[in-house]
Swiss-Prot record:
Protein name: Dihydroorotase
NCBIfam families: pyrC_dimer
SUPFAM superfamilies documented for this protein: Metallo-dependent hydrolases (SSF51556)
Binding site for Zn(2+) 1: H13, H15, K99, D247
Keyword Zinc: yes
Assembly and binders: Homodimer.
Record keywords, A-Z: Hydrolase, Metal-binding, Pyrimidine biosynthesis, Zinc
Required cofactor names: Zn(2+)
Active site: D247
Pathway stated in the Swiss-Prot or TrEMBL entry: Pyrimidine metabolism; UMP biosynthesis via de novo pathway; (S)-dihydroorotate from bicarbonate: step 3/3
Role of this protein: Catalyzes the reversible cyclization of carbamoyl aspartate to dihydroorotate.
Length: 344
């Protein structure tokens, strides 16, 4: 049986929700990853260091006994965030990033930033302190096609932001287009990007294969095949600017399979295994460790994890659902289908 050994990876973009949901989703991540950057888009959002520390404690309480897992926290940037709150976040030692959501761009983003000019003072403080800005890179104007939101965001928001704050460390989250990959490659050393497993494995045809596929609907939405190939090329290139961020986003079956379903693919149950598939398909398994375990910590100024994990080429069937919210289950990516790699 073929096996590969990796330094234990980290997930630099993860949603775990709150309350009863934590008991299902946190163990999936803790089994595979040493650390994960937790997204702050709860309702209400995590906007202060104090709230982040309380949320961190709730996450840690859901980690199974004997598992070593460290949640790294982020704050939700709003028009009203103060530079002083950035100071408190930095001093907490637990908050490592601030997340920019353009208002209305994704799940629970209605409190997001309405105009980037409103947070310039905060960005200046972050630049001074070395705090990372994580960016959901889509505009939300009604006249912009949903498949073009990322490219327009680069032109209208991200490129001017990087030019104005050249020392600000920026992660372009869950990139989905060739234009985004090219922007990151061409930018200075303070700009990096996360790439999800589902954007490496799927193109937008997957949303419509034989009917509407709500469990393949995410934001940013899956793009055409040329973009998927560009993402694979970037992720497997060995360029340290690209690293693992699952954007695993749990929603209950009822919230997904409905007239107006939520955006998000749940991948935490098989995250590193799905990345292994993508890298194997690209003939680049030898570059998986750098992407999954080394590049992210290096950008965030952290040491790699000391532990290792082993993956075996041993196919397994993904359950059709996981218990989630009382009688409303969670449907994972590849439900009822097989994943080629297994964590031993």
């Amino acid at each position: 049986m073929q096996t590969i050994s990796l330094i234990r990876p980290d997930d630099w973009h993860l949603h775990v929700r709150d309350g009863a949901a934590l008991a299902t989703v946190v163990p999936h991540t803790a089994r595979r990853f040493g650390r994960a950057l937790i997204m702050p888009n709860l309702r209400p959002p995590v906007t202060t260091a104090a709230q982040a520390l309380e949320y961190r404690a709730r996450i840690l309480a859901a980690v199974p006994p004997g598992q070593h897992f460290e949640p790294l926290m982020s704050l939700y940037l709003t028009d009203n965030t103060s530079p002083d709150e950035i100071d408190r976040a930095k001093a907490s030692g637990a908050v490592v990033a601030v997340k920019l959501y353009p208002a209305g761009a994704t799940t629970n983003s209605d409190a997001g930033v309405t105009a980037i000019e409103k947070v310039h003072a905060v960005l200046e403080r972050m630049e001074k302190l070395g705090m990372v800005l994580c960016v959901h890179g889509e505009v939300t104007h009604g006249d912009v096609d949903v498949f073009d939101r990322e490219q327009v965001f680069i032109e209208q928001v991200l490129a001017p932001l990087v030019a104005r704050f050249p020392a600000l460390r920026v992660v372009f989250e869950h990139i989905t287009t060739a234009e985004a990959a090219r922007f990151v490659q061409d930018a200075g050393p303070n700009v990096a990007a996360t790439v999800t497993a589902h954007h490496l494995l799927l193109n937008r045809n997957a949303i419509f294969a034989g009917g509407i596929r709500p469990h393949h609907y995410c934001l940013p939405v899956l793009k055409r095949e040329t973009h998927r190939r560009a993402l694979v090329e970037a992720a497997t290139s060995g360029n340290a600017k690209f690293f693992l961020g699952t954007d695993s986003a749990p929603h209950s079956r009822a919230a997904k399979e409905t007239a107006c379903g939520c955006a998000g693919c749940y991948t935490a149950h098989a995250a590193i295994e799905l990345y292994a598939e993508a890298f194997e398909q690209a003939g680049a398994l030898d570059r998986l460790e750098a992407f999954a375990s080394l590049n992210g910590p290096a950008f965030y100024g952290l040491a790699p994890n000391a532990e290792r994990i082993t993956l075996a080429k041993d196919a397994w069937e993904v359950p059709g659902e996981y218990e989630y919210l009382h009688d409303d289950p969670l449907v994972p990516l590849r439900a009822g289908e097989t994943v080629a790699w297994r964590v031993l």
